[in-house]
Curated annotation (Swiss-Prot):
GO terms for molecular function: chromatin binding; histone acetyltransferase binding; LBD domain binding; RNA polymerase II-specific DNA-binding transcription factor binding; SMAD binding; transcription coactivator activity; transcription corepressor activity. The lineage of its organism: Eukaryota, Metazoa, Chordata, Craniata, Vertebrata. Residues 138-205 are annotated as: Disordered. Interacts (via C-terminus) with SMAD2. Interacts (via C-terminus) with SMAD3 (via MH2 domain). Interacts with LHX2 (via LIM domains). Interacts with WT1. Interacts (via C-terminus) with EP300 (via CH1 domain); the interaction is stimulated in response to hypoxia. Interacts with PPARA. Interacts (via C-terminus) with TFAP2A, TFAP2B and TFAP2C. The keyword DNA damage does not apply. Transcriptional coactivator of the p300/CBP-mediated transcription complex. Acts as a bridge, linking TFAP2 transcription factors and the p300/CBP transcriptional coactivator complex in order to stimulate TFAP2-mediated transcriptional activation. Positively regulates TGF-beta signaling through its association with the SMAD/p300/CBP-mediated transcriptional coactivator complex. Stimulates the peroxisome proliferator-activated receptors PPARA transcriptional activity. Enhances estrogen-dependent transactivation mediated by estrogen receptors. The keyword Oxidoreductase does not apply. Residues 165-200 have a biased composition (Gly residues). This is Cbp/p300-interacting transactivator 2.
Length: 273
């Protein structure tokens, strides 16, 4: 291995006869510049090495491995065994395509953050404020919340707004900055100041952000209460009214034991030996 490195160093460094190639940093090519003369000679070759280094890298290594010749083998292998792109690591990385990804990542972080912001706005539109689009119909005075801090939430999904046609309006208002106009739904009408946006003619506090589920329209999925008659019919059909314990308590046991106990409790007149 040492002979191989020495032979490559004789072909690599032009000042190999003055003993500089015996230095470990110069021998391995680990320094930023192996020597001043070597840097001056390799400086015009940086463009060639950056362009042709990746294409000749494997070819030069294979030729050297097969033929055993460690010196120059053509215009592409002027460094004698090393691929032309195998300069000092700092010199190679500063003049090749390796500087591209950091710059691209800095430029690409902005669209990625914008996409995340868009997704976050859509997420927060549905989860922390799930009933904002029903508030203008139920509580007209609470419609000013759509104009304040939650303006961008309403702008993300305009279909949830109360029917405004201009930016800044909510409920039924048609003027920019209006807090809440006349809203339908049997909730009455209230005209509050457009400049302040905090005027309220309702007794309900304006800071209420969540409307109770009981006052929401019945078509909301959260307010689809199960009918007691339907529930009792299911209980009677399954025979749950004839047993003393619910079947959920038996789910941790074996399926066979559960089925036998369940059948025995459903048929109390059955004689079991």
């Amino acid at each position: 291995m040492a002979d191989h490195m020495m032979a490559m160093n004789h072909g690599r460094f032009p000042d190999g006869t003055n003993g500089l190639h015996h230095h470990p940093a110069h021998r391995m090519g680990m320094g930023q510049f192996p020597s001043p003369h070597h840097h001056q000679q390799q400086q015009p070759q940086h463009a060639f090495n950056a362009l042709m280094g990746e294409h000749i890298h494997y070819g030069a290594s294979n030729m050297n491995a097969s033929s055993g010749i460690r010196h120059a083998m053509g215009p592409g292998t002027v460094n004698g065994g090393h691929p032309p792109s195998a300069l000092a690591p700092a010199a190679r990385f500063n003049n090749s395509q390796f500087m591209g990804p950091p710059v691209a990542s800095q430029g690409g972080s902005l669209p990625a953050s914008m996409q995340l912001q868009k997704l976050n706005n859509q997420y927060f539109n549905h989860h922390p404020y799930p009933h904002n689009h029903y508030m203008p119909d139920l509580h007209p005075a609470a419609g000013h919340q759509m104009n304040g801090t939650n303006q961008h939430f309403r702008d993300c999904n305009p279909k949830h707004s109360g029917g405004s046609s201009t930016p800044g309006g909510s409920g039924g208002s048609s003027t920019p900055g209006g807090s809440a106009g006349t809203s339908g739904g049997g909730a009455g009408s209230s005209n509050s100041g457009g400049g302040s946006g905090g005027g309220s003619s309702s007794n309900m506090p304006a800071s209420v952000a969540h409307v109770p589920a009981a006052v929401l329209p019945p078509n909301v999925i959260d307010t689809d209460f199960i009918d007691e008659e339907v529930l009792m019919s299911l209980v009677i059909e399954m025979g749950l009214d004839r047993i003393k314990e619910l079947p959920e308590l038996w789910l941790g046991q074996n399926e066979f034991d559960f089925m036998t106990d369940f059948v025995c409790k459903q048929q109390p007149s059955r004689v079991s030996c």
